[in-house]
């Protein structure tokens, strides 16, 4: 899938789940499950509850997301 097909949104991490999955509340109020992107995993970027993150959603499944950026 091309990167142009993704939807980028801001959200806040609510809680950590097993196997590097997170529950994320988006700015529009929806709660989705998200996993860390490969580059973030490769550079050992840690994500904790309360962190502001940028996620990518696909138009095919709006209940799952990929975390691509953690705000400082």
Curated annotation (Swiss-Prot):
Keywords: Cytoplasm, Initiation factor, Protein biosynthesis, RNA-binding, rRNA-binding. GO terms for molecular function: ribosome binding; rRNA binding; translation initiation factor activity. It is found in: Cytoplasm. Its main location: cytoplasm. InterPro entries: NA-bd_OB-fold, RNA-binding_domain_S1_IF1, TIF_IF1. Residues 1-72 form the S1-like domain. One of its GO terms (cellular component) is cytosol. Belongs to the IF-1 family. One of the essential components for the initiation of protein synthesis. Stabilizes the binding of IF-2 and IF-3 on the 30S subunit to which N-formylmethionyl-tRNA(fMet) subsequently binds. Helps modulate mRNA selection, yielding the 30S pre-initiation complex (PIC). Upon addition of the 50S ribosomal subunit IF-1, IF-2 and IF-3 are released leaving the mature 70S translation initiation complex. Component of the 30S ribosomal translation pre-initiation complex which assembles on the 30S ribosome in the order IF-2 and IF-3, IF-1 and N-formylmethionyl-tRNA(fMet); mRNA recruitment can occur at any time during PIC assembly. HAMAP family: IF_1 (MF_00075). This is Translation initiation factor IF-1 2. It comes from Chromobacterium violaceum (strain ATCC 12472 / DSM 30191 / JCM 1249 / CCUG 213 / NBRC 12614 / NCIMB 9131 / NCTC 9757 / MK). The lineage of its organism: Bacteria, Pseudomonadati, Pseudomonadota, Betaproteobacteria, Neisseriales.
């Amino acid at each position: 899938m091309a990167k142009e097909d993704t939807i980028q949104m801001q959200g806040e991490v609510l809680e950590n789940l097993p196997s590097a999955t997170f529950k994320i509340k988006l700015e529009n109020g929806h709660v989705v499950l998200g996993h860390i992107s490969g580059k973030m995993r490769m550079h050992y970027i840690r994500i904790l509850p309360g962190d502001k993150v940028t996620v990518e959603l696909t138009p095919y499944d709006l209940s799952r997301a990929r975390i691509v950026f953690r705000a400082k």
